[in-house]
Amino acid sequence: VQSALLRMQYAIENLNGPCVVPGMTGTGKSALIRYFAAEYPRLRPFVHIVFPALSADELTRMILAELLTDTDVAVPASREAVFREIRSALRRHTLQGRRPLLFFDDAHQLSDEALLQTVLPLLTLAESDPNIQLSVILAGQPILLPRIRRFGELSERVTAASPLHGFTAAETSEYVQQCLQLAGAERPLFSDDALTALHDVSGGIPRRINRIGDMALLVGFAEQRTIIAAEQIESLAGELLPNAA
């Protein structure tokens, strides 16, 4: 996650084209979205595209609607007019000291049409106009990167590919301890063997760690255990993640 974060920061701060963030479900893409929204107040407007499975025209119009500061301005009907308004809106934000960020969540769901008729023209527009500062992040399942590489014009503009992988065993242990401290725990609640088991059964994927760890604490509380052991983790993993075993 740290490596992906650093690459994304570099791409954004240097306006080096779009950053592609491929990763399995639960590897932390949503956490990165929250981080950039909170830590980079200059990245405004922060346009978070949650449902990208739209036609190119629908997606382009949605982006314009998010960029417009005057809610009374109507989104034009023609595609050419929509892109003219997008250019004007991006110039206006840049002139006022802001840097818009387009964050495409689940970007693997973007159609080829949307990639070539919405995303690519937006990148070309930003490249060709010195009065526009625009950052673009495409986050999605691992299939996203090979899809983008199919299109030369789009692929050559990608300056950072930041795959999200699961935590290492040490990172899993550190993550769990930090979560417990934030929750007010004053002593370890998982044995070392339990932390190792938690990493093994979760693959280091944060969402799985949270799911199994939370249930282990709940069951441990009900059974009045003072510490969670590896056996409890393995038993719960079989119930909660039968396909991951």
Give the positions of each predicted feature.
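Conserved small helical "lid"/interfacial subdomain of P-loop NTPases
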Residues: 165-191
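Conserved NTP-binding/hydrolysis module of P-loop NTPases
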Residues: 45, 54-74
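Conserved Walker B catalytic segment
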Residues: 87-91, 95-138, 143-149
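Conserved AAA+ ATPase "SRH/arginine-finger" region at the nucleotide-binding site
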Residues: 49-53, 148, 159-172
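C-terminal alpha-helical "lid" subdomain
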Residues: 26, 73, 101, 181-245
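Short regulatory helix/loop adjacent to the ATP-binding pocket of P-loop NTPases
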Residues: 35-39, 142-159
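Pre-Walker A adenine-sensing motif
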Residues: 1-12
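Walker A/P-loop nucleotide-binding motif
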Residues: 14-35
